[in-house]
Structures are given as structure tokens and as C-alpha cells.
Amino acid sequence: MPWRILVERPFLGDFFNTGRGEIEKFSDKTIDELVRACFAMGRVKTGALIVMEDEINLGEYIRTGIDVDAILTSQLLINIFEKNTPLHDGAVIVRGNRVVSATCYLPLSDSLALSKDLGTRHRAAVGVSEVSDSLTIIVSEETGAVSTAYKGQIEHDIDADHLRTQLKLLQNRHREPGKFELIKRRFKNGKEASKNLHK
């Protein structure tokens, strides 16, 4: 398989970046563009790997790729993953409504529960889902099937409605404050309590 840019890497997330107080949520338009792109690529068997960042910061993996920082559109994704183009290997990472990086390295899952027939792209999708709360979309270059990986589990050969539902669930998922935000709140509350004692 010529697509071999993904290698096994440890997750080195920064403590203060692991949970962010402000999460960049993606819009309904971004969902439409993602679904359109994935199934357009599937029809012509263009392989793709798209990681939707959620609360856990994926900066460690973003830095392994090439900066894109562009509004996500279906045509942009199709252009990135077009075969024999400089950006088609590796993963795209999406933050909010923007493609932040392409050709990113991801950790490969070594889970014994996965089929031995699973390819590198699918193992990378599961791998990043094991170390983060991201949702990863995979388009198979062999079959054109669209699959997703989330929390270490993979769903194979889903249809457009199911992908849209998964993206909506991620978009609307209840988010609790991250660690850094909780620390800031406790520090602020402590300062306010101290002020009240001295009034």
C-alpha cells in the first residue's frame, strides 16, 4: 500500500491544552460540506482521513502536518485528497469550521480487537480516537466505503444520513469545562472569597 505516512507515535498532549474552555463548534454548513465531500470521494474511490477535533487539543498531531488554515468546503477536501497531489497522504485535521492542517501523522492502533485485514488508514483513525475525543471519518480507496472511528470503535460502510447524524451528535454534545477552565474558576472563586473575608 503506497499510503504509508502514518506512523506510531505517542500522544504528548499538553496538560493545559487537553481541555479547552472555548470549543470551536462546527456549523451545519460544515456538516453538509463534509458529507458531500466524503461521498463524492467514495464514488471515485479517493482515500481520505478527516479528524474532527473536539475538546482534546490535537496540536501535537497538527504540528506534524502542513498548515492549511482555510474554511472547510467540499471542494477543498476533494482537492487535498486528490491522488498524486502533495497533500493527499496523511490526515486532515478540522477545528471548528476550518481545515487547520493536512498530511498529519496519527498514532496507529495496536488493539487486538481490530481485524488483521484493517488497513493503515483505518488503524490510524482508531488510534487517534483512542487518545482523544475526536471523530474521524475514513474513505476507503479500495472500496469507496465511508467509515467512522470514535472512542476506539469503528463503524464500517455507513450511509450519508448516518454520517450526518454522528456529526450532529458531536456538534451538540454536552461539553463540561476542561481542566484548565476549572482551575481558572477555582482560582477566581478563591480570590473572591478572600476579598469577602477582608471586607
Where are the language model's segments positioned?
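Divalent-cation
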Residues: M1-K199
